[in-house]
Amino acid sequence: MSWLPKSPKARRRLMLVAAIAPVLAVAAGLTLWGLSDSISFFYTPSQAEAARPAPGRSIQLGGLVAAGSVVKHPDGRVEFTVADQDAEDRVLFQGDLPDLFREGQGVVAIGAFREDGVFEAKRVLAKHDERYMPREVSKALKEQGEWYGDGQRPEHQGDAL
């Protein structure tokens, strides 16, 4: 075998690398597989519509709670709509909503889409105060021109000041 190193020391080193490499590859693969359940991507309703995450895949859905969309059922279920400028998604949640949850406020729902396109949330996070919004939500809303925080005012085309 002419491609093997001639020195016994170099051959041992090559054999050691050849033995360790598959073990490290398997360890890395198992680590990534184990973490796959805890990885959750953030989407706004319009991004979720474009990306169409697989039903059952855990994601974070963020946007504003649409006015007039909150429906509380006697069995503890809550239905509401999370919206951005271009799209909206119906959300179902079983449990107690955060105290600061209300219409027109930023929210992040953690859960998955069902086969019928309804988002089933396992957790719902709301804003802390009037100035706070989760970084992902504020970034996405700023990109769409819908969020006006930090003293900004809406810019309307054709305004004469």
Curated annotation (Swiss-Prot):
Which residues are listed for heme binding in this entry? H128, Y132
TM spans (from-to) = 14-34
What's the domain of life for this entry? Answer: Bacteria
GO terms classed as biological process: cytochrome complex assembly
Membrane topology value: Single-pass type II membrane protein
Those parts of the protein on the Cytoplasmic side are 1-13
Any one GO molecular-function label of the UniProt entry: metal ion binding
Which locations, inside or outside the cell, does it occupy?
Answer: Cell inner membrane
**Protein keywords:** Cell inner membrane, Cell membrane, Cytochrome c-type biogenesis, Heme, Iron, Membrane, Metal-binding, Signal-anchor, Transmembrane, Transmembrane helix
Among its keywords, does the record have Lipid metabolism?
A: no
Please give the Pfam families that the UniProt record associates with this protein.
Answer: CcmE
So which stretches are on the Periplasmic side? 35-161
Keyword S-adenosyl-L-methionine included in the entry's annotation: no
Cellular component, GO annotation: plasma membrane
Give the protein's function. Heme chaperone required for the biogenesis of c-type cytochromes. Transiently binds heme delivered by CcmC and transfers the heme to apo-cytochromes in a process facilitated by CcmF and CcmH.
For this protein, the record's HAMAP family field holds: CcmE (MF_01959)
What protein family is recorded? Answer: Belongs to the CcmE/CycJ family.
Q: What is this protein called?
A: Cytochrome c-type biogenesis protein CcmE
Question: Which organism's genome codes for this protein?
Answer: Phenylobacterium zucineum (strain HLK1)
Gene name linked to the record? ccmE
